[in-house]
């Protein structure tokens, strides 16, 4: 066998090995380790969901989605279930997002996982948003991307001082999905637009002050709060709200500190009220304050395509229902999978970690209206339907 043939054989073998590794991660396994990625327990009249991948900051997998969705639906219909609690194991994270590295690697290996993953993830986001039973998300630790989708659409979101919120998708060539187009434009003023385009991180009580959490509890009291919720007998929504309100009122950490963005809200509202990303950049340049220039520096590092998609996503989402937004975001997700920037962003941030993505196109002015329209185009029979 010649050297060239040997090289071809080795290349094929390596590709085969990569594909098998990816499939191993994504397969709907019956094995214990896959089942234990999420714990589903009935405690009295409460259904408890525990995201259980602490080594991976409870990043969301297709297997987890496929366990949570049917159980959530069952509990919603069960007359003996009065409350649903969702939390993360390990203390560091509620959920750091979807396992996007695996999705990107699968796409590169021609394993079409993304259409299934995003479809089922968004179906779950909608199920959380439409859940008829009180739904309490204990967002302690890192809560980003897919973790936001599992919490923000529910009735109650309880943050602690360890909560770290962000929608950092424009830095990896994506957009703030999982219903970001619904909840972000509904935050005060233009705060949601600012968070979406810059990926700015909010911590602790600021997650509550921004309107993302409904309550704040000191982390040392979180276990007690959960115990008190579990002790409720056939509680009404009002009973649950009362317990949460009591803990919120008693919380002490950062109680007297003002919202971290309070002094900048006027700038945020004026700079981010523009209808194009180019105008937002111009507004920040003209403002010239250290805060504005800092945000300008951040925005200039993001994927130009992602920035334009995101602004339009939020503008359109401001007048849509959650289901309409998720249908739109599914179209965007599939367009991003077909494109360059998502895979390049994952490479630069999560794989090689050189933090130097080479975006294509690299300049905002090269992202045309036609490019944008193609991202938002209907997928016909492949559209997400509820």
UniProtKB/Swiss-Prot annotation:
Highly expressed in liver and kidney, also detected in heart, muscle and brain (at protein level). Not detected in lung. InterPro entries: ClpP/crotonase-like_dom_sf (IPR029045), ECH_dom (IPR045004), HIBYL-CoA-H (IPR032259). The modification N6-succinyllysine is found at residues 55, 92, 221, 257, 297, 301, 353, 377. Residues 1-32 form a transit peptide. Substrate binds at residues 121, 146, 169, 177. GO terms for biological process: branched-chain amino acid catabolic process; valine catabolic process. It catalyses: 3-hydroxy-2-methylpropanoyl-CoA + H2O = 3-hydroxy-2-methylpropanoate + CoA + H(+). One of its GO terms (molecular function) is 3-hydroxyisobutyryl-CoA hydrolase activity. This is 3-hydroxyisobutyryl-CoA hydrolase, mitochondrial. The lineage of its organism: Eukaryota, Metazoa, Chordata, Craniata, Vertebrata. The gene is HIBCH.
């Amino acid at each position: 066998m010649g050297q060239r043939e040997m090289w071809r054989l080795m290349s094929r073998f390596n590709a085969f090995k990569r594909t098998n590794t990816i499939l191993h991660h994504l397969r709907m396994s019956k094995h214990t380790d896959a089942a234990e990625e999420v714990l589903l327990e009935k405690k009295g009249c409460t259904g408890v969901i525990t995201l259980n991948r602490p080594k991976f900051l409870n990043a969301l997998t297709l297997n987890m989605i496929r366990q949570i969705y049917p159980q959530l639906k069952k509990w919603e219909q069960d007359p003996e279930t009065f409350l649903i609690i969702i939390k993360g194991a390990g203390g560091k994270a509620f959920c750091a997002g979807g396992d996007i590295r695996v999705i990107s690697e699968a796409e590169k290996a021609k394993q079409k996982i993304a259409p299934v993953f995003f479809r089922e993830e968004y179906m779950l986001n909608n199920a959380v948003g439409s859940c008829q039973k009180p739904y309490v998300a204990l967002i302690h630790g890192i809560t980003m991307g897919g973790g936001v989708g599992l919490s923000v659409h529910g009735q109650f979101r309880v943050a602690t001082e360890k909560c770290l919120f962000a929608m950092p998708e424009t830095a990896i060539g994506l957009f703030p999905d999982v219903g970001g187009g619904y909840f972000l434009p509904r935050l005060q003023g233009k705060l949601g637009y600012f968070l979406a385009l810059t990926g700015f991180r909010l911590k602790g009580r600021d997650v509550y002050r921004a309107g993302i959490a409904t309550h704040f509890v000191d982390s040392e009291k979180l276990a007690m709060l959960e115990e008190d919720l579990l002790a409720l007998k056939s509680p009404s929504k009002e009973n649950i709200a009362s317990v949460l309100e009591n803990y919120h009122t008693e919380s002490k950490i950062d109680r007297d500190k003002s919202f971290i963005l309070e002094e900048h809200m006027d700038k945020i509202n004026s700079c981010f009220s523009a209808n194009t990303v180019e105008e937002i950049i111009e507004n920040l340049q003209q403002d010239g304050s250290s805060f504005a220039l800092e945000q300008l520096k951040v925005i200039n590092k993001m994927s130009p395509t992602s920035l334009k998609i995101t602004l339009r996503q939020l503008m359109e989402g401001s007048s849509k229902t959650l289901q309409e937004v998720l249908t739109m975001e599914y179209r965007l997700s599939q367009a991003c999978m077909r494109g360059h920037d998502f895979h390049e962003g994952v490479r630069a941030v999560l794989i090689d970690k050189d933090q130097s993505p080479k975006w294509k196109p690299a300049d905002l002015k090269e992202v045309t209206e036609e490019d944008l329209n193609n991202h938002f185009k209907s997928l016909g029979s492949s559209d997400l339907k509820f």
